[in-house]
UniProtKB/Swiss-Prot annotation:
Primary role: May play a role in photosystem I and II biogenesis.
Protein name per its UniProtKB record: Protein PsbN
Pfam families, per database record: PsbN
Lineage, broadest ranks: Eukaryota, Viridiplantae, Streptophyta, Embryophyta, Tracheophyta
Any one GO CC term of the record: chloroplast thylakoid membrane
Amino acid sequence: METATLVAIFISCLLVSFTGYALYTAFGQPSKELRDPFEEHED
């Protein structure tokens, strides 16, 4: 395979894995540990 193809595949895989990790952090098990600043400030 050509170098440009390998680089494009690598960057695509990196982007997909980063997006998957971000979604897991936002909506998966670690999301229970996130704090909500809007709930902390009661007016």
